[in-house]
């Protein structure tokens, strides 16, 4: 009996851990949403870009791994996975406003989940076939940094779940003066 409980517990943990790693590619993203598609961000020019050495100096090791190497932080460990604080979420690499707390919801996957992006053109997407899966990767449209993935199992009205790494975003209180000013700077 103890073995059965251990197996059930292990299966439950595994299901949670892969919650943001698998899913259907959102059909809505392939046709029309607030995201713009890109097939190869390495060849793209972004308004804000640094050399990889500059990124390493600017970001923490965890941020660099997630944002620049398309890494994933462990589930239920990130700073924002369960926060309910109001505000906007900015790209941790360049400061672009990406998401608002009104669109954040508890998906149970262990990463911050949003049903929509702040505005059209804030993120871009590309197909991701890593780890033997087909997913849709989400990147900052301003600097090309990896944010997470988007799936088609989110709440109405969008039906989308933007599963985002905490290390890739920073929460800013909207009661702070100047919260909505563009903190990004073009670096060429």
Could you tell me what each predicted segment is?
Residues 47, 56-90, 96-188:
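A short Gly-Trp-Pro
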Residues 9-14:
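Hydrophobic helical h-region of N-terminal Sec-dependent signal peptides
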Residues 29-57:
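N-terminal low-complexity, Pro/Thr/Ser-rich intrinsically disordered segments
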Residues 25-27:
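Post-cleavage N-terminal segment of exported redox proteins
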Residues 1-8:
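Bacterial N-terminal signal peptides that target proteins for export
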Residues 16-19:
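C-terminal motif of bacterial Sec signal peptides marking the signal peptidase cleavage site
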Residues 21-23:
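Bacterial signal peptide processing site
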